[in-house]
């Protein structure tokens, strides 16, 4: 298994994609909304992906809830992370967050999808890229909600990915469109934004981490996703993280500062990433596959899901039905709440 995660164009594989998935550097595939028409088609696409690759790939998606939910029709409408604590008492918020983690994971694993890149551990709602994807503006409250969501995911059999290390919540720029700079003192980042990562790592609740395409100017001139300081010195050595480190999508403008696609990929691997994401640019992905030196990343097998969910059986279960009803209601209440605030 190799260290590259890429994407495919549509609802089913084409001939070129079948060949690309056999490349020894490919170890994963991420799905997007454009790959989804309905649940039956999605299940068949994942089957095609499994059949095309020589080794079992890690199949991933961003199914967080709120505005980031790639699969909607036929799946539970998942609430935005901010909604749990914002409009519920503490006990209800904790219960709903845990059920959301369980239900999201169960619905994805019923499609034979290994991981959803969740939860978001960024603090606060000012960032254009984050907003309601953050659980809370208070680090301890965010950690409590995230821990509940994680326990739900783990109980279903899905591994967790905390993002975006060491914290994307304070920058207003969107790293999908430009390279954000966080100019705050390093001490503030370490004692405010990074605390949630530190505590969840200590509790052994994070199986993987995705760093931010953000330059923390008081620490390093490179984005965290390509920074040996953040990934090796801080994340591995100081925090003792032993799980998988993903790059964020190297096609994002925030990664362009690291050079060509192949240079971005090599820089991220050299900095300490275990798996690099190259999405939404077939030419860029092929360039990475053509130019990266051969490398094995067998540790990625730890991310395979361990759930045994049949979609029909899951949706007939009382737990799913109760969770589906409660989470759909929370999503609707959150919409109404935002309207009263003029958002």
Curated annotation (Swiss-Prot):
Q: Name one Pfam family in it.
A: Glyco_hydro_3
Metabolic or biological pathway: Cell wall biogenesis; peptidoglycan recycling
Q: Name one GO biological process term.
A: regulation of cell shape
Can you tell which superkingdom this protein's organism belongs to?
Bacteria
Keyword terms of this UniProt record: Cell cycle, Cell division, Cell shape, Cell wall biogenesis/degradation, Cytoplasm, Glycosidase, Hydrolase, Peptidoglycan synthesis
Report whether Cell wall biogenesis/degradation shows up as a keyword of the record. yes
- A single GO molecular function term of this UniProt record: beta-N-acetylhexosaminidase activity
Q: Where does substrate bind?
A: 62, 70, 133, 163-164
- Show the HAMAP family listed in the entry: NagZ
Record-linked NCBIfam families: PRK05337.1
Recorded protein name is: Beta-hexosaminidase
Name its species: Yersinia pseudotuberculosis serotype IB (strain PB1/+)
